[in-house]
Amino acid sequence: MARDPGRVLIFDTTLRDGEQSPGASLNLDEKLAIAQQLARLRVDIIEAGFPFASPGDFDAVQTIARQVGRPDGPVICGLARATRGDIKACADAVAPAANQRIHTFLATSDIHLEHKLRKSRAEVLQIVPEMVAYARSLVDDVEFSCEDAGRSDPEFMYQVIEAAIEAGATTINIPDTVGYSTPAEFGALIAGIDAHVPNIGQAVISVHGHNDLGLAVANFLEAVKNGARQLECTINGIGERAGNASLEELVMALHVRRSYFNGYLGRAEDSSEPLTGIQTEEIYKTSRLVSNLTGMAVQPNKAIVGANAFAHESGIHQDGVLKNRLTYEIIDARTIGLTDNRISLGKLSGRSAVRARLEELGYQLDGDDLNDAFARFKELADRKREITDRDLEAIVRQNAQQIEAYYQLAGVQVSCGRDLRATATVTLRTSDGEECSQAAIGTGPVDAVCQALNGLVQVPNELVEFSVKSVTEGIDAMGEVTIRLRQDGRLYSGHAADTDVVVAAAQAFVNALNRLVSGQKHSPLHPQRAPLPAPAL
């Protein structure tokens, strides 16, 4: 049997696989903020990035390793292809962490071998132990993944896994890379590895899955029943295509259905010992933080953290919940840190009160960041009587979007109305302090603003998404605008909130432009799509 750590380990890859969601690019400060919150959530392993991809990714992993990788904190992991250059860069990046891991991978499915790697099975069986052994010479904790395991020949994969463990791999990860497996198939795959790999007792079995068929969480739970003890997942299930297995759904399934899963971990059915080490009260604020910083909204009916997860429309349901919440709720909302708290912050509230509430929401702001957020708070408080948690989150989100400010919005004025052509005049301030203005006409005020901004910056782009939603209720609510721009196949998102949605749209467009300009300077490799150089064997 595979090595059993005594509970289910949670491996969070929000900062690596999650960031590969279209438009979900994060800067260093945003990655660090998420990593710090993941540590408060008490995930076991943080996959902080792909260090070889770009200098920016290397710096992010190294900074997280230095600031979050404390002796009592999570393992800090980096991804590396099965090459010496990747593995050495990964080892250097995670070196400041007290607990380090290198996660290296190579495809094992015939379709990947033939069409992507152009390598034979014999070559793979030579590369894997060589590269795992090299990684193990640099760190004590090495994870090896059989990419596209769900479509691999099991007998060949058993050989690869055995060779990887023999070379020093401490965790063997089985990815359903394209989300193709069904729960029964995936469970059988894990059971087969547990039964047919002779040295599997020296390694923990891990699983990684995508949600292309909506089965990722179900597959993982079936894997746990068959011996998997590490789950690779992301906050809010973000990730490429249809996303990854959702951390909050997995953790709460194991929490709520503990008695069902206890037996599969060799425990008594009525054991109250948690199956994971997750601090569940941090789930909701972690979800909000990731949503705010990536700009990826959580769908209202999303399990656990969606806006409707604890809402009841039916009169019968409402009556039952009012009498006893257990009639229609299987989870106490407080378990995930969700409260009905409506804070009494207003224009007379001081900096300390704002800072304290932001910290409760998972935001650690100091210095200029706190000053900027407080200034925006006071500006909003002059226009709104009641400031809610969502308003505060929108303020912080807007601040985070402006960290790399190549352009700053200095002013915007629009003129529009029925039977009038919408006209906008915008003023931008560049990073060297120069101000420039331009006017433009459009089909509406937002289009006119975007035309004027594009005329000023002269950066080719295509507007592919514009959305606006109310942050809170009421006529004085802030409108939150999301804009996505596309250039050369890459998406860049911008977000802003204001009680004037046209101003919010202008700021969101500028934020997206800043990310686009920054992205042109730091274009990373994609770990699965980058060409694999010949390893030094």
Swiss-Prot record:
HAMAP family in the record: LeuA_type1
Annotated binding of Mn(2+), by residue: 17, 208, 210, 244
GO biological process: L-leucine biosynthetic process
GO CC, one annotated term: cytoplasm
Enzymatic reactions: 3-methyl-2-oxobutanoate + acetyl-CoA + H2O = (2S)-2-isopropylmalate + CoA + H(+)
Protein family per UniProt: Belongs to the alpha-IPM synthase/homocitrate synthase family. LeuA type 1 subfamily.
Sorted UniProt keywords: Amino-acid biosynthesis, Branched-chain amino acid biosynthesis, Cytoplasm, Leucine biosynthesis, Manganese, Metal-binding, Transferase
Organism field: Synechococcus sp. (strain RCC307)
Localization per Swiss-Prot or TrEMBL: Cytoplasm
CDD domains per record: DRE_TIM_IPMS
Required cofactor(s): Mn(2+)
Role played: Catalyzes the condensation of the acetyl group of acetyl-CoA with 3-methyl-2-oxobutanoate (2-ketoisovalerate) to form 3-carboxy-3-hydroxy-4-methylpentanoate (2-isopropylmalate).
Known EC number: 2.3.3.13
Protein name as annotated: 2-isopropylmalate synthase
Domain of life: Bacteria
Pathway: Amino-acid biosynthesis; L-leucine biosynthesis; L-leucine from 3-methyl-2-oxobutanoate: step 1/4
Domain Pyruvate carboxyltransferase intervals: 8-269
Cited PANTHER family: 2-ISOPROPYLMALATE SYNTHASE 1, CHLOROPLASTIC-RELATED, HOMOCITRATE SYNTHASE-RELATED
Pfam family, one: HCS_D2
Annotated stretches, region: Regulatory domain: 408-537
Subunit record text: Homodimer.
Any one GO MF annotation of this record: acetyl-CoA C-acetyltransferase activity
Principal subcellular localisation of the protein: cytoplasm
